[in-house]
């Protein structure tokens, strides 16, 4: 994944994650590198770790606390934020700690082995594969097509979904979506009616970037392939009662179907 470079350099280590905003002043002991009681993670060391928290807060003295951590050899190997602010960014630069922001922090889990390039903004997680896929919602009148995934597919077996598939190398999401529809439903008479911003989902060893599309069909029935066992045409409001793949209901909302 790629965020915004804040402080140059490379760092790696196990993730230590705080859900709330963090102040280095009073939040960590520079002499030990251990977090304080106020953080809710008292005694946890950030020394040599990739320290992940939403944003900084507190006094500008916090910048010097980060520098003090470095003087004691207890600085984190890197810092990741959702949104950087001046105090932490300044401290990271002063202490030569690689830092990246503009990341979806929900994709990280405590103890992940994380690699950070603060010069390019590239961040990766060891053992976690990243894939780009498309999901197309097929609409006919006031109903949408819901497909049950078979036991032969690699993920989310038995769950209900739209028409989904990988974006192949050299292919754009706009090219992948209609190709998957033709392959999985054996139809050609469809027109694009909308699209939404990508959704990024973390499952244990996988990060999925999902590109949602909406296509309209008129009167044409479908012929499903081996990837699905059955299908239903339903009003979008009824989909919430089904066991759908992760992010599916959000896709419907983003496509303004709910």
Language model segments and positions:
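Feature captures the catalytic cores and cofactor-binding loops of soluble hydro-lyases/lyases
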Residues: 3-11, 16-124
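Conserved N-terminal beta-strand and adjoining loop/helix that marks the start
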Residues: 128-145
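Active-site-adjacent beta-strand/loop module that shapes the phosphate/pyrophosphate-binding cleft
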Residues: 140-142, 198-221, 232, 236-237, ...
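Conserved Nudix-box catalytic region and its N-terminal flanking loop in Nudix hydrolases
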Residues: 143-187
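A short coil-to-beta-strand element that immediately follows conserved catalytic motifs
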Residues: 187-197
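Charged phosphate-binding loop/patch that engages nucleotide di/tri-phosphates or the phosphate backbone
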Residues: 249-258
């Amino acid at each position: 994944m790629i965020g915004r470079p804040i402080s140059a350099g490379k760092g790696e280590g196990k993730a230590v994650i705080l859900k709330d905003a963090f102040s280095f002043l009073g939040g960590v002991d520079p002499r030990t590198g251990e977090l304080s009681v106020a953080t809710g993670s008292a005694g946890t060391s950030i020394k040599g770790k990739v320290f992940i928290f939403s944003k900084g807060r507190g006094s500008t003295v916090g910048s010097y606390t980060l520098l003090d951590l470095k003087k004691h050899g207890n600085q984190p190997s890197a810092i990741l934020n959702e949104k950087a602010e001046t105090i932490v960014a300044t401290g990271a630069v002063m202490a030569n700690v690689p830092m990246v922001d503009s990341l979806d922090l929900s994709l990280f889990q405590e103890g992940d082995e994380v690699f950070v390039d603060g010069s390019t903004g590239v961040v990766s997680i060891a053992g976690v594969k990243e894939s780009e896929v498309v999901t197309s919602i097929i609409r006919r009148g006031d109903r949408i097509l819901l497909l049950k995934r078979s036991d032969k597919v690699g993920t989310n077996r038995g769950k209900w979904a739209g028409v989904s598939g990988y974006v192949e190398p050299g292919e754009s999401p706009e090219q992948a979506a209609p190709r998957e529809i033709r392959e999985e439903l054996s139809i050609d008479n469809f027109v694009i009616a909308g699209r939404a911003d990508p959704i990024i989902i973390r499952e244990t060893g996988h990060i999925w970037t999902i590109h949602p599309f909406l296509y309209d069909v008129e009167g044409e029935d479908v012929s499903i392939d081996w990837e699905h066992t059955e299908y239903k045409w339903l009003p979008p409001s009824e989909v919430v009662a089904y066991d759908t793949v992760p992010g599916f209901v959000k896709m419907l909302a983003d496509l303004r179907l709910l």
